[in-house]
Every structure is written in C-alpha cells, then in structure tokens.
C-alpha cells in the first residue's frame, strides 16, 4: 500500500471519526444512496415462478452458495427479498463480525429470498454497488455497528437505523469505478494468498491426524511383525499387542456432582475444561445450566467424557475436576491404561468412525449409550509402550500445531492488510486514480 500517495487536497468532513477527506468527495448517509430491504410488491403476479433460496449459513465473505431453489409463493412471506446486484449483509452475531457480506449474482430468474437475518441493500444512481459493498467492510463502520448491536447472547443484531443513517464519504461514479477496479484486483490477490495458506494448513492438520492414527494403532517400529487384530476398525496391529474389550481398560464413573464442583464444558477444541475458561478462550458467554443440577456427574482430572448426543469429535479428556451434564458418560481409566495414549486414540479418525458405525443402527432420536462404547474393542500395547507412543506424539503434535499457529497468524495478518487497504481506499486516504 506504500506505493499509493494521498490526494493533493483534503477538507474537514465534519464527521469526527472520518476526519479529513479529499476535497471533491461528498458526504452521504447510506439511505441517501440506497434502499434498505426493498419492497417485493412487484412480485405479486409472478408467485408461481422459481427463485433462489439463501439460508444464513450460505452467505460468506464475497460468496453466496446458490444451490437451493423455491417457488416465490413458498417464501414470499417471512423471508428477505433480493435481486441480482443487491448487497447482502448479515446483521446478527457472529455472522456480522465474520464479515458475511456479498453481492447477489446468478439468482434463478434474477430473484432470491433468504434469512430475515440478512439485510438487503440496493444502491441507486448515486452509488456503484461494489463501492458501497467495500464501504460496508470498512473497519470503523464495523466497529461502530458492533458497538450498537442490541439483544443478548447469540441473538445480538445491528439495528436497522445504523445501516440507514450511517454517514459515509464517496467520490463521483467514475472515480468509484476506478477505486473498485483496484480493490477487486488487490483483494483477489490477497484472497488467493489466504486460500493457499488455508490449503497448506489443512494439509498439516491431515498429516497430524494421520500421524496420530498410525501411531496409536500400529506403533512406532516400522519393522515390527504384524498380526490381524480381528477388529475391522483397527486392522493389523503389532504381533505383541493385545486387543481387549473397552471395559478391561475403562469403567463408567457414576458419581454425582460434589457440592463444590465447578461446571465443566466438554469441547472438541479444548477438551473438558471449566466453563469459565471456555468463555474466556472463546470471548463469549454461553448458557449456564440452572435446572437438574443434582443430576450432574462428577469428573476427575484425566477422566474421559463422551457426549451421547454429539460424539462425532470422539471422546474428550478431562483437564480439570468438576461436573458435567447428566447427558454425558464419564469414564475412568483403570490401571494399565495410559491416559495420554488413549486421549490420542479416542480422537483418531478410525476410532471416531468406529463410534459412528456402532451408532449407525440407533433409531433416530435415541442417544449413544455406555453399552455402545463397550462394544468397541481397543488396542492394548504394554503400559511402557503406551507411554512411549504418547510422549512421541506429544512432541510431534506440538511441532505440527506450532506450524499451524504460524500459518494462522500469517492468515490473520493478510486479513488485516486486506481490511486496511479497503479502509484507506474507500475513505480517500490513498489516491487510486493513477492506477
């Protein structure tokens, strides 16, 4: 961005947070240059025609997924209406903070309906839609809009009046076009770099999972003689390993919560940690249990917790003492089971697939239960070998995680650079007229 110079002459915008703007730029409220949530009365006679349908989860930054179709009459009431070239922007948390905004294009019959949590902005002759699209990604606009959100928890929304009355600055249409052309080029370049880094990060994560799965089911000695485990999900194991029922290694802890137990959160991302710590790490509040507290289950450090309703992420290791919902099964390791080894095994792709297979024939609406866990046999190296494998994985996983963290940091920096360039361009801090 250093190659771009400022405009030759600036003036005071009269808006404190905007400050100085190019002398020939104008100040306008968003509602002066656009229509917010346009009326759909013109569609009354075409209600039998098809249109695109857009759930909230299919709106992302600069992307909408157009794979759902409805008849207009089925979605006419109760959904947001939009057309090709309209700006679609999420108004609810966390979608707004995640910059879920795009311009509609390629809609069936040029028409779409979607979630009411999407605001639709249709520019008029005073503004080019892509210029306003970039303006709505400007950092200070987003900061102010987030600070004005109303509601509680996960239902906080940007008020409509923020979109209508917010003051922006803009040049004439020809200059807007020039700015947008350069923004399109530069953001596409940055997005391509981000895409490459994300693919590299996914490869690292795949390598991490493959390493874990191989180590916990095949060991670390590539020359060891193998045998058939007799268990489909495990396959071959070293000849000296055992394969035993889960109950030989783990027992269900049925202890009720203690009076002084802290509430724990069983998460795929962090394991089983205090609820307060989870809220701190995620920087958000989550619902706290207030009913049936006497039915909660006690958890000790290094116990395992299995969600009967959501087991796709495997079984989580307890990293603190406390209590969890009665909807969980709590497992205590017996003598001869190295907790860290089984922590890796229980999060491996093969074991998770085994749980899914075990639960495949469970009638819809029922949960996985302890009996289903018991069905899965487990590999059993010696305790010494379990410890050796877990120490090896601790080192290798930490190394891969450090690489992933570096890639994530570089992606965050690229995203910051993208936002900074957009902000500088749409507020007139840099002059893009010379290309």
Regions found by a protein language model. Give the residues of each.
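Sequence-specific dsDNA recognition surfaces
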Residues: 11-14, 31-43, 52-87, 247-259, ...
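Amphipathic alpha-helical coiled-coil/heptad-repeat segments
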Residues: 1-18, 24, 170-224, 380-435
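A short glycine-rich beta-alpha junction/loop motif
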Residues: 10-13, 111-119, 150-177, 308-309, ...
